[in-house]
A protein has these predicted regions:
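A short helix->beta-strand "capping" segment at the edge of beta-propeller domains
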Residues: 11-26, 56, 200-201
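Beta-propeller fold detector
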Residues: 19-20, 59-63, 99-103, 156-159, ...
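A short loop-to-beta-strand structural motif that recurs across blades of beta-propeller domains
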Residues: 48-50, 88-90, 143-146, 185-187, ...
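Short loop/turn segments immediately following beta-strands, especially the blade-tip
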Residues: 189-196, 274-280
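Blade/loop signatures of beta-propeller domains
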Residues: 4-17, 36-37, 46, 139, ...
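Beta-rich, blade/repeat-based domains predominating
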Residues: 17, 23-39, 64-83, 88, ...
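Short, solvent-exposed loop/turn segments at conserved positions within beta-propeller repeat blades
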Residues: 44-45, 84-85, 131-142, 181-184, ...
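Beta-propeller domains
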Residues: 39-59
């Protein structure tokens, strides 16, 4: 990976030295860094959640993951997972107990939850598109962006015929960002105190490639996995591209200082050191 343009006028990322930290998987996705010092990521066809601790070999975090894709941690260190095969959202506590948080909307099964983020106050947001054979078994006639409240109530933030994919929050937790793989854009939603999203708008259009997962740094810049990792400002200005050896699916900031960007890309996971810290909600 080589960053082709600086992320901001005051920083130069023209020389980066990527490191392949895990490989020989089928299709990696859903990286999420735990404050306990390790990265969790999914191997979707392998039906596993993996755990990578720097300096150690990757290990199985959870076998038979029900087609896990996106992952996110909360303030209590619990792991939230989008299970595409079982079509549900689960939460795994630090003892390994798995709890189902969402699997239906108005009595109908979700399509196939894809990506998820948890705000500092515990509000949960996730995308629910349908790809491939999932489209043939759908019970809902739309793809959605959902919100789960503190009380476990599920609301639809947005409905569409096209497919939302990656999801992330601004550093202050007041803006929700969602990529759309069909429209090749990123939509932004202003969030209120209760987690609702009253103001929807297109922030970024005509992304090079098919946008997938995304993350945000502490300055509010967006890192979008597409043909490469495309970097945009919070205002939607394209700032640069992190060239990838394989097509990236997602990314996450990690390491104790949150200045490493972990990128899942096909069979492997890569790590790139940056001069900016990632924004995390936990």
């Amino acid at each position: 990976m080589i960053l082709l343009a600086p992320v901001s006028s005051s920083e130069d990322f023209s020389e980066l030295h990527p490191q392949k930290v895990a490989t020989n998987y089928v299709f990696t996705e859903g990286p999420a860094w735990s404050r306990d010092g390790y990265l969790v990521f999914s191997d979707i066809p392998g039906n596993k959640l993996l755990k990578f601790t720097p300096g150690e070999q990757p290990a199985i975090f959870r076998d038979n993951s029900n087609g896990a894709i996106g992952n996110s941690f909360d303030m209590q260190g619990r792991l939230y997972t989008c299970e595409s095969h079982s079509r549900r959202i689960t939460r795994t506590d630090k003892k390994g107990k798995v709890e189902v948080l969402a699997e239906r909307w108005q009595g109908k099964r979700l399509n196939a939850p894809n990506d998820i983020v948890v705000r500092r106050d515990g509000q949960i947001y996730f995308t629910d598109p349908a790809f491939g054979s999932q489209q043939d078994t759908r019970e809902l006639d739309f793809c959605g962006v959902y919100h789960i409240s503190h009380r476990g109530e599920i609301d639809v933030i947005a409905k569409s015929k096209t497919r939302p994919n990656g999801i992330a929050l601004s550093p202050n937790g007041k803006i929700l960002y969602v990529t759309n793989s069909d429209e090749r854009n990123v939509r932004a939603y202003d969030l209120d105190r209760n987690g609702g999203a009253p103001n929807e708008r297109v922030l970024i259009s005509n992304i090079a490639g098919i946008p997938d997962g995304l993350k945000v740094d502490e300055s509010g810049n967006l890192y979008i996995a597409a043909n490469q990792v495309e970097v945009y400002s919070a205002e939607g200005q394209h700032l640069g591209s992190i060239r990838s050896y394989d097509t990236p699916s997602n990314c996450a900031f990690g390491d104790p200082d949150f200045q490493s960007l972990y990128v899942t890309a096909r069979t492997s996971v890569y790590r790139v050191r940056l001069n900016v810290k990632g924004s995390v909600q936990y």
